[in-house]
């Protein structure tokens, strides 16, 4: 019985480490977004209840000079982009111009809280 459990456990753990896919969400300036995420009252124990994620995403929309980016999915989870993803995102922002809300489709691989980006495109 344990012989069957070990390969199954290994496959389950390995699949949780990284997986490829396509995701829709918002592109944000990483420094701004992380600053907003950490801008909480130290005595507040309900930091996720008091958040206005939509405002944070709009406030931290990427600028033409942004160099580091994060992707925020529909559930409000944020993922840092890898260096190649940052390069692709900066190029996209320069081509598209400034927007109040920068919706994108990202193709790549999630590894923890980081996205290894294969492609990124603006979406409506």
Residue ranges of model-derived segments:
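Bacterial N-terminal signal peptides that target proteins for export
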Residues: 1-9
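Gram-negative bacterial Sec-dependent N-terminal signal peptides
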Residues: 10-14
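OB-fold and OB-like single-stranded nucleic-acid-recognition modules
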Residues: 21-124
């Amino acid at each position: 019985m344990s012989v069957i459990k070990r390969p199954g456990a290994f496959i389950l753990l390995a699949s949780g480490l990284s997986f490829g896919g396509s995701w829709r969400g918002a592109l944000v300036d990483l420094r701004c977004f992380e600053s907003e995420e950490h801008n909480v009252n130290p005595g507040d124990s309900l930091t996720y209840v008091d958040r206005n994620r939509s405002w944070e995403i709009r406030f931290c929309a990427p600028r033409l000079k942004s160099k580091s980016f994060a992707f925020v999915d529909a559930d409000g989870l944020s993922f840092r982009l890898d260096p190649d993803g940052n390069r692709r995102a900066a190029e996209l922002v320069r081509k598209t111009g400034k927007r109040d809300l920068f919706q994108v489709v990202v193709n790549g691989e999630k590894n923890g809280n980081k996205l290894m980006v294969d492609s990124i495109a603006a979406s409506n």
